[in-house]
Amino acid sequence: MTATIEAAPPQSLTDHFLHSFDLAHGMVLQLAEDFDDASARLAPAPHKPLVWFLGHLTCSTDYFSTLHQGTESLVTEEFSRRYAGNDNQDWSIGPSLEEMIDLYKAVHARMREFVAGLTPSDLDKESPLEPFGDDRLKNLGKALAIIQMHDAYHCGQVGCLRVALGKHVPF
């Protein structure tokens, strides 16, 4: 007997992008659930702490918004300098875990609203601003794909951090 696989109902491109964008975001939040302020700042070598991941992902999504939505940044220059790159810092200082999660959610919500209004023809648009360091971010469709992959990539690293800290990975 041969099994028949039915095709899924067609999905709009916008729904596809929103699903992918929300999936990685939700996974990061799920991985952060059982951290507290102290454990969110711990990271055995060679890992980065959870607060860095949250700040880094916030910076990248915020940067996308400034490039393609023309919005003002939701993060300060100091915040961006601290979390956008890979430098090691004194992670014992900085916003609380709750503040970091709230900012990550706010940046996601702002971009989600923008993505929900996109049409397929919008994906070919170019940012009027010059991207810093990565020309692939100039095109809206490419930048959107990169930001989704970026969150998913770091989600895997947060999973590795959890294992290094003796925590269970929930998925």
Model-derived segments and their meaning:
Residues 2-4, 14, 18-22, 29, ...:
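Short, contiguous alpha-helical
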Residues 17, 21, 25-28, 32, ...:
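Hydrophobic alpha-helical core bundles mediating ligand binding, dimerization, or RNAP-core interactions
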Residues 87-128, 142-147:
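Acidic/histidine-rich alpha-helical segments that form the ligand environment
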